[in-house]
């Protein structure tokens, strides 16, 4: 019997998504996905997903723009692993732009305007550049121009023991004839391969006049080897997103972020269906057409329609479902997350707009369900809070190593910066109503290991469902081929750990 016949479901044993979400508002724990037929290894599963219309992520995960989750360290880690980080905006414009630049420069790919000096520059200048900008390899060119004729290169190791700081770098540089160079044009992968085979730290790429076109570094080649699925722009830099509010004053923030090099602008609002956001989307798409715009948050199709009509490239779905969010409790407004994702994402898909599941995700199973019922990628907050890459310091309480984690609608966050209040349209109010809480979470170690665990978990989830990608799963969900079951409270209890005196829970183990 052929595998295609084994994969066909001839008995209707389960509930379709359309039936499942036809009435009640459901969260992830309220249903389970029924298994399919397996004829492939889990390593063959492609978990990639569209973050925006033009940006595909190898790992369909995005870190939330919260001031206790995503700054430059988290954004770098997310992009290295194939996802993307959204740097929060509860800070000054200058601080946010500086964090964006830190991410964009972490892996350079082709350095299009490499730092260069003239041959008569003193050694002291090179040392100052190293201490101020962290650059350890500087080209020496005619006139000191970044696109001038190459004369040599001076590295930190060349001048470590030079006592005369006034001596010209020409005395200590590695000369052009002793350098490995390549001719333009060359593909980034080819340039990295040359660096791997050479024993030099840098590879200048020159035109036929021996003038510098760009530069590649060994450090970037190592990072390319260690993180082959990194999210990169066309120049080989890490992808980076940043959040902003949608008031008139925020146009200056967008200008600074665009100059810093962001790839995606995330409009941060708990309720995105406003005249402010509609107008802001139109302005951004007209003024900065190269920027991808993620709009939201939304939980209904009508909300989604207005933002898509305005020009949104992606939508964030979720209102009041996060672990530190109390919007539904305080304001009686929102929607259960699984239902919101299914309803909004199905409409958005008909318009060619991808969606981000934002909130309510507690484990790999929840992420799998969110992706299965419509989301293209998942935004993580509490799941990655407490990792070493998040902002803040660890502290101990009752013998546990903890890190602070708070909602952007908490009083603590709104008092720290006015931008957090803008998210909830309350920055100018004398009395601010909290829509979030502040708390702490356990130390989770490095997010790099946690993301690898989530990636493998998603692959195994898709394998059990019987499909080789989440695109295929969503297609089968919409066709009624992937089926579900509602879960009673006792069924949920049965599916959790039970009937044990005690147990130890470890999420994953690495085999060396």
From Swiss-Prot:
Q: In which pathway does it act?
A: Purine metabolism; XMP biosynthesis via de novo pathway; XMP from IMP: step 1/1
Q: Which cofactor does it need?
A: K(+)
The biological process GO terms on file are: GMP biosynthetic process; GTP biosynthetic process
Which major enzyme category is it?
A: oxidoreductase
Catalytic center at which residues? 325 (thioimidate intermediate), 423 (proton acceptor)
Q: What is this protein called?
A: Inosine-5'-monophosphate dehydrogenase
Under the heading SUPFAM superfamilies, the entry gives:
Inosine monophosphate dehydrogenase (IMPDH)
Localization annotation: Glycosome
């Amino acid at each position: 019997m052929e595998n295609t016949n084994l994969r066909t479901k001839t008995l209707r044993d389960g509930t379709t998504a359309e039936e499942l979400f036809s009435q009640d508002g459901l969260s992830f724990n309220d249903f389970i996905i029924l298994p399919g037929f397996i004829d492939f290894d889990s390593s063959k599963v492609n978990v990639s997903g569209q973050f925006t219309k033009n940006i595909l992520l190898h790992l369909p995960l995005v870190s939330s723009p919260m001031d206790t989750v995503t700054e430059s360290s988290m954004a770098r880690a997310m992009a290295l692993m194939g996802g993307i980080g959204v740097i929060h905006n509860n800070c000054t414009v200058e601080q946010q732009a500086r964090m964006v630049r830190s991410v964009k420069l972490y892996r350079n790919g082709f350095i299009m305007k490499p730092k260069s000096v003239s041959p008569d520059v003193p050694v002291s200048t090179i040392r100052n550049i190293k201490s101020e900008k962290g650059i350890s390899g500087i080209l020496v060119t005619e006139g000191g121009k970044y696109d001038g004729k190459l004369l040599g290169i001076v590295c930190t190791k060349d001048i470590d023991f030079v006592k005369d700081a006034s001596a010209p770098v020409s005395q200590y540089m590695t000369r052009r004839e002793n350098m490995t160079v390549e001719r333009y044009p060359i593909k980034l992968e080819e340039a990295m391969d040359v660096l791997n085979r050479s024993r030099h730290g840098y590879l200048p790429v020159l035109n036929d006049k021996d003038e510098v076109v760009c530069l590649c570094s060994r450090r970037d080649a190592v990072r390319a080897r260690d993180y082959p699925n990194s999210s990169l722009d066309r120049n080989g830099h890490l992808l980076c997103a940043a959040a902003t509010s949608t008031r008139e004053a925020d146009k200056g923030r967008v200008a600074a972020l665009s100059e810093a090099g962001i790839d995606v602008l995330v409009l941060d609002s708990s309720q995105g269906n406003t005249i402010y956001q509609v107008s802001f989307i139109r302005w951004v798409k007209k003024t900065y057409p190269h920027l991808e715009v993620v709009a939201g948050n939304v939980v209904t199709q009508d909300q989604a329609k207005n933002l898509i009509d305005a020009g949104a490239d992606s939508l964030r779905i979720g209102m009041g479902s996060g672990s530190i969010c109390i919007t539904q409790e305080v304001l009686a407004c929102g929607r259960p997350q699984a239902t919101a994702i299914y309803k909004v994402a199905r409409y958005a898909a008909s318009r060619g707009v991808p969606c981000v599941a934002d909130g309510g995700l507690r484990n790999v199973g929840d992420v799998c369900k969110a992706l299965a019922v419509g989301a293209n990628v998942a935004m993580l907050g509490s799941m990655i809070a407490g990792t070493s890459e998040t902002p803040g310091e660890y502290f101990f309480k009752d013998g546990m190593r903890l890190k602070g984690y708070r909602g952007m609608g908490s009083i603590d966050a709104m008092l720290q910066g006015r931008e957090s209040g803008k998210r909830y349209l309350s920055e100018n109010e004398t009395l601010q109503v909290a829509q979030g809480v502040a708390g702490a979470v356990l130390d989770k170690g490095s997010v790099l290991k946690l993301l690898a665990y989530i990636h493998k978990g998603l692959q195994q989830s898709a394998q059990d469902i019987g499909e080789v990608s989440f695109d295929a799963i969503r297609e089968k969900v919409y066709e009624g081929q992937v089926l579900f079951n509602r879960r009673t409270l006792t069924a949920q209890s049965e599916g959790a750990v039970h009937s044990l005196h005690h147990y130890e829970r470890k999420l994953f183990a690495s085999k060396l």
